[in-house]
Amino acid sequence: MHIAVVGLSHRTAPVEVREKLSIPEELVEKSFNNLKKIDQILEVSILSTCNRLEIYSLVKDPQLGIEAIKSFLLQFSGLDDEILSPHLFNYVQEKAVSHVMRVSAGLDSLVLGEGQILSQVKKMVRLGQDHHSLGPILNRLLTQAVSTGKRVRSETNLGTGAVSISSAAVELAQLKLGQAHGRDQLMTLETEKVAVVGAGRMSRLLLQHLQSKGCCSLTLLNRTKKRAEDLSAAFPDIQIDCQLIDELDSCLSLSTLVFTSTAANEPIIDAEKLIKIDRKPLLRLIDIGVPRNISSDAKSVSGIESHDVDDLQEVVSRNQEARQKLALEAEGLIEEECRVFLEWWDSLAAVPTINCLRSGLESIRKEELQKALSRMGPDFSARERKVVEALSKGIINKILHTPVTKLRAPQSRNDRRDSLDVIEKLFNLDVSSSLNKPKNN
């Protein structure tokens, strides 16, 4: 068995490729079912965010398992192999373990130390459990990854002052406004006519950061007005005009700055729409949706300044050097957590031998106990029989305690294999045969 991860991220693929592998809510169950049907996969879960799609799995054979997952990704995306494959990465065993720990800690994020990824890793664990696709190995790994993410944020300064995708989007708007006035600095958004399209979690974060940057009024559009009004109620200090998304054209004509973050699978704003409406001289569009809410052809329209999630790098790079230094604090913790998991993983190699040894001694115990009880005759009470049986079990447990503890203790793989060989020879254990025995139901 091998732990493997196959996927792509903002580091390996542009948004136009990533959006092809964004799994919408309605296709999550089907995706899990298709992955579970793959013979090579023993356990599996999916991490899907705006910046990454990663399949974590326990596979029988690493090469065959990775190829099977790659085939799933090709089929799901509809992309040709020569287009998708250059953007995919895969890690096995130690590298896969290290990767998920780093992802959960925010070390692999566009914004180092951002907190939202931890919630997304938690969701990956929950999805795997809900779809009954996690077994003891992957459940242990992903649960420990969540704990590692929490530990990094509580024991280091990496999470302090970390920006998110939403805050980076607001900062990008401030930066572009400053540059338009000939200044390489962030400017307040007080005078901007702002609109936010979408009322989900990312939009909530957008509103938080817009409020902190001086925005005191905006238009909020959503497919259902009630959800927009519920979100608006959480921000009483901002004057929010809630509208249905049907009013998008009107909103675009009145706004100077529009943020989009919807779950739409197709663009809701394109060049054709922008050309038709009567707009302000300059309209800034910032799209943090994946798949993209704004078509790439919007950039070709005069008076339109359009940005997507990949453009956030301009903002992130401004304070990345300082955050890289903070990331060094987390690396030691991640190495420690990886070592703990891998030691546990290695200790599993002893389980078949331990079970075989325990089974052999248990057979001897039962056989000898039966002989002894038969010699005691009918005068031996049921209570006395229980005492003798408990005594025999206690002796077996005492005999097993030291070798089992030694076999499970952290040690090199070669040392563990040597210890297992000695035990198997001394007790004449046929571990391979015991593994192939059918289980009693």
UniProtKB/Swiss-Prot annotation:
Pathway: Porphyrin-containing compound metabolism; protoporphyrin-IX biosynthesis; 5-aminolevulinate from L-glutamyl-tRNA(Glu): step 1/2; Porphyrin-containing compound metabolism; chlorophyll biosynthesis. The active site is at C50 (nucleophile). It comes from the Bacteria. It holds the Pfam family Shikimate_DH. GO terms for molecular function: glutamyl-tRNA reductase activity; NADP binding. InterPro entries: 4pyrrol_synth_GluRdtase, 4pyrrol_synth_GluRdtase_dimer, 4pyrrol_synth_GluRdtase_N, GluRdtase_CS, GluRdtase_dimer_dom_sf, GluRdtase_N_sf, NAD(P)-bd_dom_sf, Shikm_DH/Glu-tRNA_Rdtase. Keywords: Chlorophyll biosynthesis, NADP, Oxidoreductase, Porphyrin biosynthesis. GO terms for biological process: chlorophyll biosynthetic process; protoporphyrinogen IX biosynthetic process. It catalyses: (S)-4-amino-5-oxopentanoate + tRNA(Glu) + NADP(+) = L-glutamyl-tRNA(Glu) + NADPH + H(+). Substrate binds at T49, C50, N51, R52, S109, E114, G115, Q116, Q120. The keyword NADP applies. NADP(+) binds at G198, A199, G200, R201, M202, S203. During catalysis, the active site Cys acts as a nucleophile attacking the alpha-carbonyl group of tRNA-bound glutamate with the formation of a thioester intermediate between enzyme and glutamate, and the concomitant release of tRNA(Glu). The thioester intermediate is finally reduced by direct hydride transfer from NADPH, to form the product GSA. Belongs to the glutamyl-tRNA reductase family. This is Glutamyl-tRNA reductase.
